[in-house]
Amino acid sequence: MATPAGGRPSQPQPQAQQLSVDFEALSYISSLVEAFQAFDSDNDGLVTAPELRGLLASLGLDKPEHEVRDMLARADADRDGKLSVEELLDVMNAGQLGLGALGALLQSAVPALESAAGPDGVLGADELARLLSVMGTASVEDCMEIIACMDGDGDGAISVEEFRLMAQLL
């Protein structure tokens, strides 16, 4: 071990742990959330059986009405006859995709991102990259890919609200 001029051996610096992100899984979850929001016709955060059927069809999963009703009955944890986005992700096995570490990182970044966002509440890849790179957990390329996966309209940015929702759902 090297000895600096002060005479004491230098201590090894802890390495920032790199985040391993399955971008395909993140993109899948993001597409489920976007489809959910598109089919939640009254914007109450819940989908009914007909809305669920349309949502599934939009994802290429055209199911007969009875299968959709069975799926809703199995996934409806609070038995209100509707599915929340969390219940949808559960029934679609999104929780088994191993994105918990990313979710924890994103949740810890939300307060700083709120202050980093522009006046319109929108985050670009550069804001996310700057913050997560400082946290030492994600490369700029990873941050750009995260934004791309979560960017529903393709403008290269996401709102703080969308970011917060995805962080909570992961």
UniProtKB/Swiss-Prot annotation:
Superkingdom per UniProt: Eukaryota
Binding site for Ca(2+) 2: D76, D78, D80, K82, E87
PROSITE patterns reported for this sequence: EF_HAND_1 (PS00018), EF_HAND_2 (PS50222)
Gene3D superfamilies per UniProt: EF-hand
Start and end residues of each EF-hand domain: 27-62, 63-98, 138-170
Keywords: Calcium, Metal-binding, Repeat
Residues that bind Ca(2+) 3: D151, D153, D155, E162
Residues involved in Ca(2+) 1 binding: D40, D42, D44, E51
CDD domains to which the protein is assigned, alphabetical: EFh (cd00051)
SUPFAM superfamilies, alphabetized: EF-hand
InterPro entries on file: EF-hand-dom_pair (IPR011992), EF_Hand_1_Ca_BS (IPR018247), EF_hand_dom (IPR002048), EF_hand_pair_protein_CML-like (IPR039647)
GO molecular function: calcium ion binding
Pfam families in alphabetical order: EF-hand_7, EF-hand_8
Task performed by this protein: Potential calcium sensor.
Protein name: Probable calcium-binding protein CML29
Organism from which the protein derives: Oryza sativa subsp. japonica (Rice)
Gene: CML29
